[in-house]
Design a protein with these regions (language model features):
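Helix-to-loop junction immediately C-terminal to a conserved catalytic motif
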Residues: 47
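ABC ATPase NBD coupling module
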Residues: 63-75, 99
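Conserved ABC ATPase "signature" region
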Residues: 106-121
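Conserved ABC ATPase signature
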Residues: 125-129, 133
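Hydrophobic anchor residue at the start of the ABC signature
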Residues: 139, 185
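Catalytic Walker B motif of ABC-type/P-loop ATPase nucleotide-binding domains
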Residues: 150-153
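ABC-family nucleotide-binding domains
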Residues: 160
């Protein structure tokens, strides 16, 4: 489990003001928010790529050495490509082991590539595979270090519906059998119903969405069917309390 407490960040304006969030093991947490509300800033805090502006607990312990923790325990897939086009997929994965300071483990590499359904692309370069395959390879790259925390910034934004569904389902299958916390920052409504926990950035706080909303949707058999989910939501929840309305923005 990861706990972020008392997160306060101000640049030319206030981004976060005493915000908090908890990430659970073996689960996908999704953070929503309009552009400029601080989703990427939050990922950078969790990814230890910026000076800490919060109390950060990983497995109940404070972060003593951010550089080592980031190197060994955190995988981060940015919006920009994290793969090298002058290297094959296999060479990229080997390089991921090198970056994390771990010895190359071919069995682990093959297991992860199979879990992302890209094992047949080992000898291809990233610029010669499809967009969906490339994104799954980027996630595989981040998983090679066996991270405790995996951060994904808009991972499905450029994918069609088929590849979007495949990516999020493969990721969900993987993390529910591995002790990893996953945080996804996204605008993509197609993947919202895959979240174990949902948050939205509002008024400089990280606000949890009510679990009852998810449970009601599950009883209607629309879970994991994004189009039906959105239709149901509009028909049955739009007249409910104002605390729900921001979810559609």
């Amino acid at each position: 489990m990861i706990d972020i407490k008392h997160l306060s960040i101000t640049f030319d304006r206030v981004i976060f003001d005493d915000a908090s969030i908890t990430l659970s093991n073996n689960s996908i947490t999704i953070i929503k928010g309009k552009s400029g509300t601080g989703k990427t800033t939050l990922l950078n805090q969790l990814g230890l790529v910026a000076p800490l502006a919060c109390d950060y607990l990983m497995e109940g312990h404070s972060i003593e050495d951010p550089l080592t923790t980031r190197k060994e325990k955190i995988g981060y897939v940015h919006q920009e490509s994290t793969l090298f086009n002058n290297m094959t997929i296999r060479e990229n994965m080997k390089f991921a082991f090198l970056l994390s300071g771990q010895e190359y483990n071919e069995t682990r590499m093959n297991d992860i590539l199979c879990s992302m359904k890209i094992e047949h692309l080992l000898n291809q370069t990233p610029d010669h595979v499809s967009g969906g395959e490339r994104q799954r390879a980027a996630i595989a790259f981040a998983l090679m270090k066996d991270p405790y925390l995996l951060l994904l910034d808009e991972p499905t934004a450029s994918l069609d519906s088929i590849n979007c569904k495949l990516l999020i389902e493969l990721l969900s299958d993987y993390i529910h059998t591995h002790p990893v916390c996953v945080l996804i920052a996204t605008h993509d409504k197609r993947i919202i119903d895959y979240a174990d926990d949902l948050y939205e950035i509002q008024n400089h706080k990280i606000v949890p969405l009510k679990k009852s909303m998810i449970e009601e949707l599950e009883t209607t058999s629309v879970t994991r069917k994004p189009q039906n989910y959105l239709s149901y939501y509009k028909k049955h929840l739009i007249r409910s309390s104002k605390s729900y309305i921001y979810f559609l923005v």
